[in-house]
């Protein structure tokens, strides 16, 4: 990433604040978050917001909001130090529940580049660029303190899995932003704790993700523990139905002195 990615942090924070303020005016978006088990405290702490369908307030301020972000719940993506690097948007209406996350790239390096992007937008050729996911972990900024305290981190797949864990008090978690665990991810996590606890979806994709995790974590001296969810569950749906009691009991079992395997699995 270049230094340009960190320019205009004050403006990015202002956008995040405004999007967060927008949220309270849209009952459907608020209800969706409540149904996902995401508390108001976490909504505010994480800076979750909403981009209305008609929203273009920042179009002419060297900041380009992709039309794909409109009508979506917005999530600021932060680096380990809390700086905003991008936004993700999530459709929440029933007709488009499974639409892929769209990313808002907001780093035009000059007014002329900003104007060029606006012109592209007007011609229907907007830019929908992503950010380098292999160098970032969602929620790391909020998770660091508890990771140090507990000496372990939950690994989850999705942003909303992470946010739901936060709402249940399991703040020591990170989401992989739609990519597999990289060497950079593992090295970064090893700075804060010794053990990774994989809490992945109970499907084939979740199992495949585990195959790569163990050797990657082993390279940096981290242990891998696995909590297997029942079939058909992902972390947020499991927590909504069962709470965190069994998950915490599984962690206690894994951390006992007589359980010293580098890879250890508990089925819920």
Question: Where would I find each of the regions flagged by the language model?
Answer:
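Short, aromatic/basic amphipathic alpha-helical patches
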Residues: 209-217
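Conserved nucleotide-binding/hydrolysis micro-motifs of P-loop NTPases
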Residues: 160, 180, 203-205, 230-234
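Arginine/glycine-rich "motif VI" loop of SF2 helicases in the C-terminal RecA-like domain
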Residues: 188, 216-222
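Acidic beta-strand-to-loop metal/phosphate-binding motif
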Residues: 153-155, 193-205, 227-228
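C-terminal or mid-to-C-terminal helical accessory/interaction module adjacent to the motor/catalytic core
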Residues: 225-268
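TOPRIM metal-binding catalytic domain and adjacent DNA-binding surface shared by DnaG-type primases
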Residues: 1-73, 81, 144-148, 258-268
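Hydrophobic anchor at the start of a short beta-strand
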Residues: 172-174, 196, 223-225
């Amino acid at each position: 990433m270049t230094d340009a990615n960190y320019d205009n942090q004050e403006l990015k924070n202002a956008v995040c604040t405004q999007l967060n303020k927008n949220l309270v005016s849209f009952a459907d978006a608020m209800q969706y978050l409540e149904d996902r088990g995401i508390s108001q405290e976490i909504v505010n702490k994480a800076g979750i917001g909403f981009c209305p369908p008609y929203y273009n307030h920042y179009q002419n301020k060297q900041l380009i909001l992709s039309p794909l972000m409109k009508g979506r719940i917005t999530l600021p993506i932060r680096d380990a130090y809390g700086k905003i690097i991008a936004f993700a948007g999530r459709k929440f209406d029933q007709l488009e529940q499974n639409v892929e996350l769209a990313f808002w790239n907001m780093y035009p390096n000059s007014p002329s580049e900003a104007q060029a992007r606006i012109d592209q937008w007007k011609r229907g050729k907007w830019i929908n660029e992503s950010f380098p996911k292999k160098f970032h972990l969602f929620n790391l900024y909020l998770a660091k303190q508890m990771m140090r305290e507990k000496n372990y981190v939950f690994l989850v797949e999705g942003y909303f899995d992470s946010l739901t864990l936060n709402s249940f008090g399991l703040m020591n978690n990170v989401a992989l932003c739609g990519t597999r665990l990289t060497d950079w991810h593992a090295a970064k996590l090893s700075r804060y704790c010794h053990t990774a606890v994989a809490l992945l979806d109970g499907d084939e994709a979740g199992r495949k993700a585990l195959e790569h995790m163990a050797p990657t974590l082993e390279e940096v001296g981290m242990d891998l523990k696995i909590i297997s969810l029942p079939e058909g569950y992902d972390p947020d749906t499991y927590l909504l139905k069962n709470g965190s009691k069994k998950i915490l009991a599984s962690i206690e079992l894994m951390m006992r002195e007589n359980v010293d395997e580098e890879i250890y699995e508990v089925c819920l």
